[in-house]
Amino acid sequence: LVVTHTVPLRNQWAKEVEKVFGFKPGIIGSGRFELDAPIVIGNTQTLYRNVDKIRKEFGTVILDEMHHVSSPTFSKILDTNYCRYKIGLSGTIERKDGKHVVFRDYFGNTLFKPPKENYMTPTIHLVASEIRFMDGAKIPWANRVTKLANDEEYRHTIAMLAAAYAAKGHKVLVVSDRVSFLKACSELTGDKSVCVTGDVSHEDRETLVDEILYGDKNVLYGTQAIFSEGISVDTLSCLILATPVNNEPLLTQLVGRVIRKKEGKISPVIIDIHLKGNTARKQASNRVGFYMKQGWDMKYL
């Protein structure tokens, strides 16, 4: 049993299982409840509602994006299951809130890491900007991010960077957690860009992502929530961090979106924008520390 927490992730697993093993997996979710296949992929919510029906059915349970295991929905599925093997998968085994300490309670102490040769080494391009990110401990973080996202000059900067790197042959991923900002930047970039946010249906998301994978679109604007986990678009080779990131596990996952090996792919690049202001400067130096720890080359533009 493979446990996933979104429909696109479930669909992605189903595609890969069919590609690798040559048979269609069973699906639990979206009105289906199929237990006959050797591999079954299920949605958390449906599995949670049917815990009694599934708990003695499987010998192995794989939990994708296992950093969600501390949520009651996931933990109940695992706690009640009679399976012999439990395997957790995640791009990052740390959580900012420290709850990663429960991982070993569920999955034991053995940790397998994929060999580094599955990944390419990115170069970091540090872009100095004159745009200011608001300081002030009393101003909520969300308000500060919104103010930055509504800054016309900042929107043009992001759109211009995306277009410039796309012109160099990159397939560019721009991530932010402000939907209106992403849509505005996508319009500025022009018809070679697509925008994937929470209000796009799962079917349409796949169509838009396919335009990046197989079509002539070369800039993908997407929300952090969608692209920090689960969606793999191996052709992406450039990441633009359009919202300040001060969370190492999140940064690890976002960078992971563009450094996967693929034949004919150009060397990946991460665009890190350094804004004015004390908060921005402190966060930027934390990110630079992270890049140094990974041993990645950095260039100031």
What are these regions (language model features)?
Residues 136-143, 262-301:
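C-terminal helicase lobe
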Residues 11, 22-36, 49, 173, ...:
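Conserved helicase ATPase core of P-loop NTP-dependent helicases/translocases
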Residues 136-187:
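Conserved interdomain hinge at the start of the Helicase C-terminal
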Residues 1-19, 95, 177-182:
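Conserved Walker A/P-loop ATP-binding site and its immediately adjacent core
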Residues 90-93, 238, 246-270, 288:
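Conserved SF2 helicase motif VI
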Residues 59-60, 65-125, 291:
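Post-DEXD/H (motif II) to motif III coupling segment of the RecA-like Helicase ATP-binding lobe
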Residues 56-59, 221-222, 229-244, 252-253, ...:
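A short beta-strand element within the Helicase C-terminal
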Residues 29-60, 71-76, 226:
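Conserved helix/coil segment N-terminal to the catalytic DExD/H
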